[in-house]
Each structure stands twice: as structure tokens, then as C-alpha cells.
């Protein structure tokens, strides 16, 4: 029985799935690399399904396809890291999306080993290290909840974004009613 059937989820008709996929492609998302280490083996992959969850306790969630190697790894390891890429790291994103063999991915760029064991990108726009607090399967993906144990950020970089199958970056801040 599939995870979808086990949860009682009825797959939508193809036209809704296709329309939803097209709609979601238009949601701009920050590009990240999620990394973890299991038994001395590092692994990481590019992901955009990352969001803050709570400030008390500080936490975020990531969503990973159930068929990925990192998904299985995160079910076993207690912690993971999220490195938010800069607008100058498109090639790194592509490499961690499959253009570089998994065992060679951390040879590119300035990865450093965090005190908790996993690799974190030193030149990232921001990075967050989390303790895995939960994993909720839903359909083809699992939502991993991470409680923040460490974080750092740069004041001088621009985040890399992805929208409609293209990399992009914020151009400028727009005025708000407060400024």
C-alpha cells in the first residue's frame, strides 16, 4: 500500500495536479542545500521547500521527497543543516541537484564541518543547524521538523531564489507603509 493510500489521500485528477504544479512553479523560493552526516558519510541536496515554523521554540521545517537518499538519512540522524545560497552560487545549486556525484559534492565551494558533525557552507547567505524533532509523512514527501541549535548569517550577500524553472535574485527592497 502506498503512503498516499495509507493516509487516505485521494490523488487529484490530472488536470488539477498539472495546474497545481504550474502554479507552484510561480512561487518564488529561496534556494538551499540541506546537509547531514551518517556514519562519517556526508550527503546534501538542493531544496526549496524550507520555511520557518516557530519562534518559540525556534524551529523550521523542510520537505523531502521520500525517494531521496537524504530523506532516508534524515530519518536516522539526529541533526541536519540548511545553508541558504547566495546569488553567486547557481553552479553549486546545480551540482547538489544532481550534476555532481554525491560523493564529490562537498569538494566544491567552502564547506566546513560544524561542531555537530554535518557540513555547512561557510559562504552561505545564512545557515541553520537543527535537531530533528519530528518527521511527518504526507503523500510523496516527508515534512521534517527541526529545532534550531545554531545559526549564522551574512549582512553582505543576496539570497539565491528560484521561480518558474529559473534562478533569480531580489532586485531591491520595495517601500512599505513603515518607511
Residue spans for each PLM region:
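Basic, polyanion-binding surface patches
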Residues: 2-179
